[in-house]
Amino acid sequence: MQGNLSSWLVKHGLVHRSLGFDYQGIETLQIKPEEWHSIAVILYVYGYNYLRSQCAYDVAPGGLLASVYHLTRIEYGIDQPEEVCIKVFAARINPRIPSVFWVWKSADFPERESYDMLGIYYDNHPRLKRILMPESWVGWPLRKDYIAPNFYEIQDAH
């Protein structure tokens, strides 16, 4: 089942895969990593001017990693803005997805957090470095195959 945006993308020859609708009726699309930056720019020009959220998750142990973008088309005088969910999947080994920081500045910290927790490298992100874990931390804590270290540092509460 295709929504309005998916039909528009097909009409303009833009490669994607419709994943249907979520429980709120929001259209969900899958975009290939190599197509993501150009489609992000097109979506911004089309009117999706607000990146509501970005997150990432590990699809399955040993499987793909996903970066998820919730975009909103905010227009003056519209009570119910149009929304879309974009999923970009990346291989577990050397996962790379183009950053959309230069399209939506609000992608800055969420992409850094996704990098820090899952190891997804966002190409052309200006400050991609660990944001929650220490720089010396080894591994990606939110991956399903992550093995927690056998040590815990007890710090003085004062």
Curated annotation (Swiss-Prot):
User: How is the subunit organization of this protein annotated in UniProt?
Assistant: NDH is composed of at least 16 different subunits, 5 of which are encoded in the nucleus.
| SUPFAM superfamilies, A to Z | Nqo5-like (SSF143243)
Record's family? Belongs to the complex I 30 kDa subunit family.
Compartment annotation: Plastid, Chloroplast thylakoid membrane
| GO MF terms, alphabetically ordered | NADH dehydrogenase (ubiquinone) activity; quinone binding
* NCBIfam families cross-referenced by the UniProt entry: PRK12494.1
Q: Does the keyword Translocase apply?
A: yes
Q: What does this protein do?
A: NDH shuttles electrons from NAD(P)H:plastoquinone, via FMN and iron-sulfur (Fe-S) centers, to quinones in the photosynthetic chain and possibly in a chloroplast respiratory chain. The immediate electron acceptor for the enzyme in this species is believed to be plastoquinone. Couples the redox reaction to proton translocation, and thus conserves the redox energy in a proton gradient.
Q: What is the name of the gene encoding this protein?
A: ndhJ
Q: Which InterPro entries match?
A: NADH_DH_suC, NADH_quin_OxRdtase_su_C/D-like, NADH_UbQ_OxRdtase_30kDa_su, NADH_UbQ_OxRdtase_CS
Bilayer topology reads: Peripheral membrane protein
What is this protein's record name? NAD(P)H-quinone oxidoreductase subunit J, chloroplastic
Q: Can you cite a GO biological process for this protein?
A: photosynthesis, light reaction
Keywords, sorted A to Z:
Chloroplast, Membrane, NAD, NADP, Plastid, Plastoquinone, Quinone, Thylakoid, Translocase, Transport
Q: What is its EC number?
A: 7.1.1.-
Q: What class of enzyme is it?
A: translocase
Q: Which GO terms describe its cellular component?
A: chloroplast thylakoid membrane
The record's catalysed reaction(s) read:
a plastoquinone + NADH + (n+1) H(+)(in) = a plastoquinol + NAD(+) + n H(+)(out); a plastoquinone + NADPH + (n+1) H(+)(in) = a plastoquinol + NADP(+) + n H(+)(out)
Q: Which PROSITE patterns match?
A: COMPLEX1_30K
